[in-house]
Amino acid sequence: NLGSELIQDEDEFIQLCQLNIQAGMRAKNSTAYHAALDYLSKAFSFTNDQWWESHYDMKLSIHTDAAEAAYLSHQFEKLDMFIDPGLKHARSLLDKVDLYIVLASAMVAQGKLREAVDMTKPVLAQLGHPYPAFATKKHVIIELIKLRWALRNTSIAQILNLPEMSDARHIAAN
C-alpha cells in the first residue's frame, strides 16, 4: 500500500484491491475489525465510480464488507460512506440486501430500534414478506393459525425431509 501512488496500470490497482480485500476479510474473520476496516477502506480508496460498470462485483463487495467492518468496529460515522453509494449503484434488490442488513444491525447497536424497523419493512415487502404497519396480538394470532392450518397434516419427519430453501428472495428475507 505504501507505494500505491506510483501505480499507473489498472491491472495492478485491481490486484492491489484484491489483496486489500483478502487482508480485510482475514482480519474480519479474526475479529480484528479495525484492521479489517483499514484494509477495506484502502481498497475502497483505490476505486472510483467507473468500477460500478467495469468491476461491479468487486466494487459491491468492497462497499458491503467495509460497511460491515465499520459496524463491527463501532465506527458508525463511516457507514454512510460505504452504504449510500452501494445502495445507489446496486443493480438489484438482492444485491442491496446485505447493505440493508448491515445498516439495520448498526441502527439496533446504536439503540435506534424504531428506525431499523421502519427501514426494513419496505425492504421485506419488496422481498414478498409484507408486515403490517402496527403488528397487534391479533396479527400474530392470525399468522399462527395460518401456520398451524398449513402444517396440520405434516409430521416433523416430513418437515425435516423438505428440500432446502432455494428462492433467493425468501432467503434474503430471513
PLM features per residue range, with description:
Residues 101, 111-170:
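Alpha-helical repeat/alpha-solenoid scaffolds of the HEAT/ARM/MIF4G superfamily
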Residues 1-106, 115-123, 165-174:
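Extended alpha-helical scaffolding segments used for macromolecular assembly and cargo binding
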